[in-house]
Amino acid sequence: MVIDFGERSDREVIVRDYTDVPTEKSSWDLFAASALKVEGTSNYPTGFVCRIEGWPSAQKQDCLDTPTYAEGTWAYFVTNPSLGDGWVMSGQGASIHKPVCGGYEAWVWIEGGSGDSKRLPNYTPTPRSCQ
């Protein structure tokens, strides 16, 4: 799991590696496994990521409703051996998506009004084998 706090943040990218993730677990469960604090919105408390490790601050994002790109939001990316070595935006939310052996997942903070909604994670995944 990769957490990229965005280009305007002074926070370092967080990278957590997992080897034995049960296939019945969702990507949302990876937050608990990594000891990262995650908050959902009031509408989707375990389905839409609003805040990771206190970012953005409660003053910036109240997490009552689903934030828009104009307000600032987290973008969710995945990659796995069948996709090659590049990132793609996930077509599913974290509560539905299942981790893939050898894959990576990334969360990128998109600053409101920045126009960088297509920005990829600031981390290059390396191929991994699965047992």
What name fits each language-model region?
Residues 1-131:
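Ubiquitin-like/PB1-type beta-grasp interaction modules and other compact soluble beta-rich domains
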